[in-house]
């Protein structure tokens, strides 16, 4: 009987200890604190995203690592400065800043342009109505647009206007839309963006588009204040369009603007005499255009690649601090992809577009390095947030326990020296050792709580991951 009574008392005591222990834990740390720490630990395993950071997509794990279906190791070929890689602009949508979209034919720009007007989380979303080609993208509280693109302002500087046309046209166009009072304000910021595509598949896509009757005759090709003459820019076909042309016919025309289109549209044509081919040799002309296109691409606020939709979305969001509503999707079922092209034909297309091939390799390298740089920057920020949460938790625990983590000794007046017995001296020495051990344990705990503070971040190139 006594045994059962003792057992009952012990069980009741244990239950009371557990009950009061739970109350103490809830008092020390609120539920949100523990959730934050748990989520921080979990996010570090899923790509070092801090609590509250939104994953770009609903998939588990890293949504970027294998979007293109290949897990090859990316090795940077070009050396870029931190200024080239760091892309985070202070875009004031409520101010006067404008995003200008340079739309190159057959690069997926139509899809991206629709994302800009229909898929961005905004305080004042663009107003798009069925049957209308353009959307109204006004700033909050103003009747002033923040976006210059096909689907917002239309082809206001010409059909598929290039870099040369846009940089000379957009500022004056925006000023003409404003009142006289607003024209006196300081000049606004124009953030140019574009999308590039693999040159071979872009070229095939343009051929198929022209084969179906597209001409782009409305393009102005304005340069240095004038239009090109027919001698400078002759046509590849005599009729109204080039519908039904074969790939061979498309390739043999020496005046075909599809050749190296991306390089030409991103370069400053004024540097080479616009479309006057007699100013310099062809190789010298294209070499200058390539360097100009590379320079403009580096200085653009943002550019994306059709082959990397999710990374394109991520870099745009990272650059402008804007978020898309729905994730981008990688669609490979284009008309160009359905064309069966012999290896020899592909080689000829690459030769015809050798400057675009060089530009795309350069752009791809810069794009992936920017992505890697942004991801590591995001991880550093998430790590700092975890450190701050850990410090807050430590401070709350110490505040409740009423300790500082370190022993504090106050000087006291020593008593007169008296002869001490060996036993008393030995006991005093043991007390001193226990005090030192306790202080050391407190310092170890302090160091453990701040172990992340002393870590050194390796250069991002030394830790290149499997991105492509």
UniProtKB/Swiss-Prot annotation:
Per UniProt, the ranges with Basic and acidic residues bias are: 425-437
Cytoplasmic compartment segments: 1-9
Residue positions binding 3'-phosphoadenylyl sulfate? 103-111, 197, 205, 329-331, 335-336
- GO MF: heparan sulfate 6-sulfotransferase activity
- Entry comment describing in which tissues the protein is expressed: Expressed ubiquitously during gastrulation. During early somitogenesis, strong expression in head and presumptive brain. During mid-somitogenesis, strong expression in eye, hindbrain and somitic boundaries and weak expression in tail bud. During late somitogenesis, strong expression in eye, hindbrain, branchial arch primordia, spinal cord and ventral medial somites.
Acidic residues compositional bias, start-end: 438-447
User: Which keywords appear in this protein's UniProt record, sorted alphabetically?
Assistant: Angiogenesis, Developmental protein, Differentiation, Glycoprotein, Membrane, Myogenesis, Signal-anchor, Transferase, Transmembrane, Transmembrane helix
A Pfam family cross-referenced in the UniProt record is Sulfotransfer_2
Listed name of the protein: Heparan-sulfate 6-O-sulfotransferase 2
